From Swiss-Prot:
It comes from the Bacteria. It comes from Rickettsia canadensis (strain McKiel). The lineage of its organism: Bacteria, Pseudomonadati, Pseudomonadota, Alphaproteobacteria, Rickettsiales. HAMAP family: Ribosomal_uS5_B (MF_01307_B). One of its GO terms (biological process) is translation. This is Small ribosomal subunit protein uS5. Keywords: Ribonucleoprotein, Ribosomal protein, RNA-binding, rRNA-binding.
Amino acid sequence: MSKVKKNEETLSEVLVDVNRITKVVKGGRRFAFSACMVVGDKAGRVGAGHGKAKEVNEARGKAKQAAKKRMMKVPLYQNRTIHHDVIGKSGAAKVILRRAKAGTGVIAGGSMRAIFHSLGVHDIVAKSIGSTNVYAMISATFDALNKLASPKSIAMRRDKRVNEISVKSYDV
């Protein structure tokens, strides 16, 4: 009897990037593939992974496993946007994530869009500045998502009640 992990079949997978890698050796060239994948449950959990192998399918599998290992929980406001604006950096890549009103949609490019889709965010505005390298963008986006905090967690850190901390208008 095999064990089935919960949420195993509910994870959404997005293949963000596939590259062919060439290693030049004495006898010629050796080809391999690298893949970058984002996985999420569309309910506030997301992860990204990178895998390398001789075949594309193997690289995808390794990337998927790495993404599952690195999954993280992100606090969402009304299960559709983020609680506050945040900036993330990774190397020369910088991303700005801004909360948005209902009906705005996901305004983001490339790999950021894949992350938000897998995360379950429906309304967000994201701007990338600097490097457009896929791996740097994903890393910067995860840096920004790590900085997010719900008003409840901020209040707990400050030993206060939620209504005592300064909270922006939540009519967004």
